[in-house]
Design a protein with these regions (language model features):
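Non-heme di-metal
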Residues: 2-349
Length: 349
């Protein structure tokens, strides 16, 4: 069976379209997925990748389009799937082996990016300190006051790969938790899924925003447009979600999302209104202003605090996950602003 389902309400395909390859790794994987070629070819490509990168002291996997796209596709086999690609590939051992090798390099790069995360022993206090609003103007302030419609569209495109499936990867943590900690995550995620109302699902609200500004709301439609840094942020979350050993990081990542969302969402909504858009464009952000003000308390105190109390060995990983989320947000923000300052698009052309 292949992944080619349609959303029952919109008729939009729910699986990711097959993207254009960005190098030998992704070209090999796309060939395998499209033609059922020998999956061992990806292992051979991974061998060549490791040899080529081992002597390059300037190499940065976080900015490697080929490696990041390959990881994105390998993870996507476990999520919405890839259009007209057999679901049988999801647990193919050769693809899993190649993914594991790429993950080793990717995780090492994340650790280097984040560095040593200070810990006071009080995970709740540490999370509040890490996610406190910065004094600088930031991307959200620019979007509120100065961003053009085209710049808003670019931000939405970068965010779309995650927001059109919002909550799905974090939800993977539910089955790995128990008791009050599980209940806290379920409470947060229930709101993300609209409390049972499809029209109120946050992913659906984001799709409404995309349509309002003239963009496609198809899941993965802009996969070819986003650079490695965007895919790396997406892949870091998938890394945490698909590995039980990173349960703490998954929880910490969610805490960072929830605690840094309300104020920026208010500014994004203001920016869209400044540009003349109405509630069909702003409801996604308006909803997050209210919801995430509540979610942040549940996520930090009951979810992260509860997990650290019941499983103290996960405390450092909780902080690592939060720091990773913040670091990738900074990388993407820097990419956006530096591109615009040079009069360039932040998207691939």
């Amino acid at each position: 069976m292949s992944s080619s389902l349609l959303d029952s309400a919109t008729g939009v395909p729910t699986s990711m379209p097959v993207p254009q390859a960005r190098g030998p790794l992704s070209a090999t994987l796309v060939s395998i997925l499209r033609s059922s070629a020998d999956p061992r070819e990806l292992t051979a490509a991974a061998d060549a990748y490791e040899v080529a990168r081992s002597t390059d002291l300037t190499y940065d996997i976080l900015r490697d389009d080929d490696a990041q796209l390959t990881l994105t596709l390998l993870y996507e086999l476990h999520l919405q799937g890839i259009e007209n690609v057999s679901d049988a590939w999801e647990w193919n051992l050769d693809l899993l082996a190649a993914r594991s090798r790429l993950e080793t390099h990717f995780e090492a790069a994340i650790v280097e990016l984040v560095g040593k995360v200070p810990s006071s022993g009080d995970v709740v206090a540490d999370l509040w300190a890490m996610t406190a609003p910065s004094a600088g103007p930031g991307l959200a302030s620019f979007m509120a006051k100065d961003a053009t419609i085209d710049q808003f569209a670019e931000v939405l495109i970068h965010r779309s790969l995650n927001q059109l499936r919002e909550a799905d990867v974090h939800t993977l943590g539910i089955s790995r938790l128990s008791g009050a900690v599980k209940a806290a995550l379920v409470e947060v995620q229930s709101d993300e899924y609209g409390g049972g109302s499809a029209e109120r699902m946050h992913s659906r609200l984001f799709a409404d925003t995309m349509r309002a500004v003239g963009l496609s709301d198809r899941y993965g439609h802009y996969i070819d447009a986003v650079p490695a840094v965007t895919l790396a942020s997406l892949n870091a979350l998938s890394l945490f979600g698909f590995h039980r050993r990173h349960l703490g990081a998954l929880v910490g990542h969610l805490c960072a999302v929830e605690t840094t969302s309300a104020l920026p969402s208010k500014r994004y909504s203001a920016g869209l209104r400044r540009l003349g858009f109405g509630s069909d464009a702003t409801l996604f952000y308006d909803e997050h202003v209210e919801a995430d003000s509540v979610h942040e308390q549940i996520a930090v105190r009951e979810l992260a605090g509860g997990l650290a109390s019941s499983q103290p060995h996960r405390t450092d990983d909780i902080l690592f996950g939060a720091a990773t989320c913040l670091a990738f947000d900074d990388l993407l923000g820097d990419h956006l602003t530096s591109s615009w300052e040079k009069g360039e698009t932040s998207l691939r052309e």
